[in-house]
């Protein structure tokens, strides 16, 4: 099972979402920023590293707000751990994605998210975690 961390990064009531490029697995799907936990790495450390690599920010990682296990039809499975991020240093910059944007949580279902993120997308759209 692949272990992944992702951030719910908030700014003025909006949440940061990212669109994969055409060349990534599951191309053009939307997701929350983050990535794989490397061998021997703690989840919060992995998320700090990923946010620095992908967005150029030094994030203050808050509480774990959700943990989701998902199995794709291909048989691949993933455990996603989502953490709240309300504070960070630096300006958010798009280093690897096709597009990034700040979305109103109620609008999240309009975007074509990764299947593993859909439960959380519905919760966020319903006002959870705001």
Question: What are the residue ranges of the model-derived segments?
Answer:
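Conserved Nudix-box catalytic region and its N-terminal flanking loop in Nudix hydrolases
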Residues: 14-53
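Active-site-adjacent beta-strand/loop module that shapes the phosphate/pyrophosphate-binding cleft
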Residues: 58-59, 66-92, 99-102
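Conserved hydrophobic "DFG−1" position in protein kinase catalytic cores
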Residues: 9-10, 17, 87, 102
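Generic C-terminal helix-cap and adjacent flexible tail
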Residues: 125-130
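NUDIX/MutT-family hydrolases
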Residues: 82-84, 93-124
């Amino acid at each position: 099972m692949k272990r992944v961390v992702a951030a719910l990064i908030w700014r003025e009531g909006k949440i940061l979402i990212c669109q994969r490029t055409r060349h990534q697995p599951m191309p053009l799907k939307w997701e929350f920023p983050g990535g794989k936990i490397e061998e021997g790495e703690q989840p919060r450390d992995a998320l700090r590293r990923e946010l620095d690599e992908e967005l150029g920010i030094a994030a203050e990682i808050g509480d774990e707000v959700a943990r989701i296990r998902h199995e794709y039809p291909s048989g691949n499975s993933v455990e996603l751990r989502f953490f709240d991020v309300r504070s960070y240093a630096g300006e958010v910059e798009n280093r690897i994605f096709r597009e990034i944007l700040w979305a109103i949580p109620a609008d999240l279902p309009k975007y074509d998210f990764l299947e593993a993120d859909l439960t959380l997308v519905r919760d966020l759209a319903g006002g959870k975690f705001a």
